[in-house]
Amino acid sequence: MNGTEGPNFYVPFSNKTGVVRSPFEYPQYYLAEPWQFSMLAAYMFLLIVLGFPINFLTLYVTVQHKKLRTPLNYILLNLAVADLFMVFGGFTTTLYTSLHGYFVFGPTGCNVEGFFATLGGEIALWSLVVLAIERYVVVCKPMSNFRFGENHAIMGVAFTWVMALACAAPPLAGWSRYIPEGMQCSCGIDYYTLKPEINNESFVIYMFVVHFAIPMIVIFFCYGQLVFTVKEAAAQQQESATTQKAEKEVTRMVIIMVIAFLICWVPYASVAFYIFTHQGSDFGPIFMTLPAFFAKSSSIYNPVIYIMMNKQFRNCMITTLCCGKNPLGDDEASASASKTETSQVAPA
C-alpha cells in the first residue's frame, strides 16, 4: 500500500520513513509545502467572499419581488440554498483548517464538513434532474395539458432533499464514513479503502450508481429528447415565434447550468472512481485536492448563470440594489415576465 491508513483517516503517503501523523492532530506539511496550504485557504476565502453575497442576493431579491416567485424559480432558489449550506457548513471550516495545515476540528468536524459538502453537491445535482424533467415535460409534452405548477415545484424541491440526504446521511450512521482527503484539510466520502466493517465498498458503488450515473442518464435523456423536439417544432412551426424563443432561452439557461455542473464535478467523480477501483495505487495528495477544491466552485456559477441569462431577475436585482429604483427602467422586466406562460419562468 502506498498510503497510510489509520482508524479514521487515510493519508496518501507511505509511512516507511515514519513521518506520517494523524491529520486530526498534526500539520501535514510533509504532504505539501506550507505555501500550498495557504493557497488553499486563499481560494476558500475567495469562494466565501463571492459565494455568500451572490447566493444570499438571489434569495433576497426573490423574496422582495413577487413576480419572481414562480414555480420553476423554486428549484433555482433551492440551488442557492444548497450553495449557502456549502458556504457556511463547508467552506468556512476548510478555510480554517487550511490555515493550520491539518483538520483541527477532529473526526466530528470532519463529519460535519463532509456532510454539508456532499449534501450541497447532491441537492444541486438532483435539482438539475428536476429542471431537466420539467423542461422535457413542458417542451416535449409527453403528457398533454400538463402545467408545471406550485405543487409540482414543492414536490420537486422535497425530492431533491430526500435524495441528497439519502446520499449524505448514511456515512453518519455507519454505512461508509467521512475522512480527510487530498491534503487532509477537507473531508469527503472514503473512496480510499474498502473498510468491510462499515460496508464501504457497497456504499461507494451505491453512490456512483444511484447518485451520479442515474441522474446523468436522466439529464442526458431529457435533453436529447428536447433537442429533437425543438428542432421538429421549429421545422413545422407548431408554436408561435415568441413561445419558441422563450422556451429555447429557458432551456438554454438550464443546459448551461448542467454543463457547468459537469465541468465542476466530473473531474472529482472521475478521480474518486479511479482511486476506488485502484486501491493502494500510488497517487499524491494534490491528485485528489485539485478536483475536490475545483468542485467547490459550483457554489458560484449557478446564481451567476441565472443572473446573466434572466433579464427579469436582473432587472429586479438592480431595483433592489438601487433602493427601489431601476435606472434602466422596468419595461424590459415586465416584457420578459410575460414571454412564456408554459414554463412559468422568464427567459433571458
UniProtKB/Swiss-Prot annotation:
A lipid is attached at residues 322-323 (S-palmitoyl cysteine). It is found in: Membrane; Cell projection, Cilium, Photoreceptor outer segment. It comes from Canis lupus familiaris (Dog). Zn(2+) binds at residues 201, 279. The lineage of its organism: Eukaryota, Metazoa, Chordata, Craniata, Vertebrata. One of its GO terms (molecular function) is 11-cis retinal binding. Glycans are attached at residues 2, 15. PANTHER family: OPSIN. This is Rhodopsin. The modification N6-(retinylidene)lysine is found at residue 296. Residues 1-36, 97-110, 174-202, 275-286 are extracellular. The modification Phosphothreonine is found at residues 340, 342. Belongs to the G-protein coupled receptor 1 family. Opsin subfamily. Residues 330-348 are annotated as: Interaction with SAG. Coiled coil: none annotated. GO terms for biological process: absorption of visible light; cellular response to light stimulus; G protein-coupled opsin signaling pathway; G protein-coupled receptor signaling pathway; phototransduction; visual perception. It is linked to Defects in RHO are a cause of autosomal dominant retinitis pigmentosa (ADRP). The phenotypic features shared by dog and man include a dramatically slowed time course of recovery of rod photoreceptor function after light exposure and a distinctive topographic pattern to the retinal degeneration. This disease was identified in the English mastiff breed. The chain crosses the membrane at residues 37-61, 74-96, 111-133, 153-173, 203-224, 253-274, 287-308. The gene is RHO.
